């Protein structure tokens, strides 16, 4: 009989728990709702200044004439009626406009030429002052360049010190001259003594011969 292999039964793994999907937090809506968008284009004060400067009336521009000019340019005068009045009052208080007639927003208005002239002069002065401040910066950089030749002059001043060494060579020839002079003076003296001794010997020999000859006679 064939033996059957015993198969061990392993316990099945527990089923994986499904991952809980994180809920995306929705952005909270602003309590006040969407903010009102600012109107694109030039402001009411800018339009008023342009229309007043464009008019050629000597007595100034009235409020009714301003509204007509702005409406022709595509500006909604009926909706922005309150803004126009506030802008006119603000321009008068700043001094950009002068009120010729009436009071408040009603009346006629002109540009204040004196204030415009002062603004133009102030802008012109700023442009002239700016380049003057830049000139000293370039002037400071120029004197830095001549510093390099100083190193060359210092090196040239140090180099002549090396020429002092040949002085030692001039001292050395003095010793051999003194030695030669002593030898020359001593040698003739010795030679002079030798002939004197020889002459004395010859004289003695002659005298001895003369004595022998006299004795024989």
From Swiss-Prot:
PROSITE patterns: H15. Its main location: nucleus. Residues 1-11, 28-45 have a biased composition (Low complexity). One of its GO terms (molecular function) is structural constituent of chromatin. One of its GO terms (cellular component) is nucleus. Keywords: Chromosome, DNA-binding, Nucleus. Residues 1-45, 123-217 are annotated as: Disordered. The keyword Glycoprotein does not apply. Signal peptide: none annotated. InterPro entries: H1/H5, Histone_H1/H5_H15, WH-like_DNA-bd_sf, WH_DNA-bd_sf. Residues 123-151, 159-217 have a biased composition (Basic residues). Gene3D superfamilies: Winged helix-like DNA-binding domain superfamily/Winged helix DNA-binding domain (1.10.10.10). GO terms for biological process: nucleosome assembly. Residues 40-113 form the H15 domain. The keyword Nucleus applies. It is found in: Nucleus; Chromosome. Histones H1 are necessary for the condensation of nucleosome chains into higher-order structures. Belongs to the histone H1/H5 family. This is Histone H1C. It comes from Xenopus laevis (African clawed frog). The lineage of its organism: Eukaryota, Metazoa, Chordata, Craniata, Vertebrata.
